[in-house]
Structures are given as structure tokens and as C-alpha cells.
């Protein structure tokens, strides 16, 4: 597992990572997708573009790398260094008002960002679905918690801590025909990678705690519209 993402330069990860390793997350997510060369993919909430680099290099797709933060100029320089300036197009835009016409994209990818902008009821169906072609594929990595941590009587209103089954119900209510929804096998590894890159002095005891924290689950969901 994660053979493809292992080959990337750690200096690139250190420069662009802003959370659990997006290369690992995108690698495992796309194993459950059917991306083909030449497809036009919307990478929404892409941060500094690690997921976009992976999509373009590993699948030969063209990517609109969209994030609301002011990373576009940095991302342009990074893409040039990676030889991807003609395959990945960085765009600074709000997810609620994307400047693309209806039916533009063959697929939507969103890695560890959806909870930042998409949790208003109807958001996916009204704001994102129209941008996708009929039958387009959707793949997301979402923050959540392990199913085994749910106790009887839990009233979990915070979407950041939803389980896979709760996320599945949410997206089905938003019009997505869900095909897979499960916790990522690389969850612990992706979090530890981030911790060691940003805190080189982190102790083994601190790293051990990652595997026991139910609030650090990462959920992958794929489906079609």
C-alpha cells in the first residue's frame, strides 16, 4: 500500500504539507476511483497542491487545483518545478462560488477539506453537483471518528467527528450514489508523517497516542452523481 506516494521527495512534503500527509491520503483514496488520462478533475480545497501533483503525475489527468487561501503564486512555482504547469491550474476561489460552467468536470476530489466549507445542508447538491458531468466520480477524504468509539446514546452533531456510516448517510441525502465509505488504512501513518515533519522533536510516546485517538480517524468516500 502507498507504493506510489512513497517515491515523492520529502522536501516537497515538508514544503506543502498542511495536515496528515495528503500524498498518502490521495494515494489510498484513488485506489477506489477510476481516473483515466485526459480527464478534467476538480481538486477542491487542495491547499498547497500535493494532491493535485499526485493526480496529474499518477493518472495523467488535468487538474483545476482550487483553494480559497492565497497559495496560488506559491503553487504555480511548485508546479513549474514539478514540470506540471500545463497539467495543473491553480485557482484561488471560494467553494461556494466556483467560476466554472455547468458540466465541466469528469471527477471531483477533495482531500481533508470538505468540513471547512461544505456542511450546510444542500451544499453539495446545489454548489458542486452542477459542475460535474452526468456520471462523474466523486472521491473525498473526510475527518471523522472510528465506528468502535460510538457509544449508545451519543448525540454527535459535530460533522468533524462523524463516523463512516454517518458521512455515508449525509452524502446520500445530498444526492451522491455512494460506492465506498470506510476508514483509511493509512490514517495513523498519515498523521504521524505530519507530526514528524513539523515537530522533529516529537517523542515516541507522543506518536503512540495517535493510534488511540478516536478523533483522528480519516474516512474515504467515493461515489457518482
How would you name each of these model-derived features?
Residues 107-120:
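A short SAM/SAH-binding and catalytic strip from SAM-dependent methyltransferases
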Residues 96-108:
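A short acidic, Gly/Pro-enriched loop at the edge of an enzyme's catalytic core
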Residues 122-137:
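A short glycine-rich, Lys/Arg-flanked "PGG" loop and its adjoining helix->strand segment in the class I
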Residues 140-158:
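Short, glycine-/aromatic-enriched active-site segment of Class I SAM-dependent methyltransferases
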Residues 11-27:
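Conserved SAM-binding loop and adjacent beta-strand
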Amino acid at each position: 500500500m502507498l507504493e506510489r506516494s512513497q517515491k515523492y521527495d520529502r522536501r516537497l512534503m515538508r514544503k506543502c504539507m498542511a495536515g496528515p500527509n495528503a500524498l498518502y491520503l490521495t494515494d489510498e483514496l484513488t485506489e477506489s476511483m477510476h481516473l483515466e488520462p485526459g480527464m478534467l478533475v476538480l481538486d477542491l480545497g487542495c491547499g498547497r497542491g500535493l494532491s493535485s501533483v499526485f493526480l496529474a503525475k499518477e493518472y495523467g489527468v488535468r487538474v483545476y487545483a482550487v483553494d480559497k487561501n492565497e497559495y496560488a503564486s506559491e503553487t504555480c512555482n511548485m508546479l513549474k518545478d514539478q514540470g506540471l504547469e500545463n497539467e495543473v491550474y491553480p485557482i484561488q476561489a471560494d467553494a461556494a462560488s466556483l467560476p466554472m460552467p455547468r458540466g465541466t468536470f469528469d471527477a471531483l476530489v477533495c482531500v481533508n477539506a470538505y468540513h471547512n466549507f461544505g456542511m450546510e445542508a444542500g451544499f453539495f447538491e446545489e454548489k458542486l453537483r452542477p459542475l460535474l458531468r452526468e456520471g462523474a466520480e466523486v472521491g473525498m477524504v473526510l475527518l471523522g471518528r472510528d465506528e468502535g468509539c460510538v457509544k449508545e446514546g451519543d448525540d454527535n452533531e459535530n460533522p468533524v467527528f462523524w463516523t463512516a456510516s454517518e458521512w455515508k448517510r449525509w452524502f446520500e441525502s445530498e444526492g451522491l450514489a455512494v460506492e465506498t465509505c470506510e476508514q483509511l488504512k493509512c490514517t495513523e501513518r498519515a498523521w504521524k508523517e505530519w507530526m514528524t515533519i513539523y515537530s522533529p522533536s516529537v517523542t515516541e510516546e507522543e506518536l503512540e497516542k495517535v493510534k488511540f485517538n478516536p478523533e483522528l480517524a480519516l474516512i474515504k468516500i467515493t461515489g457518482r452523481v
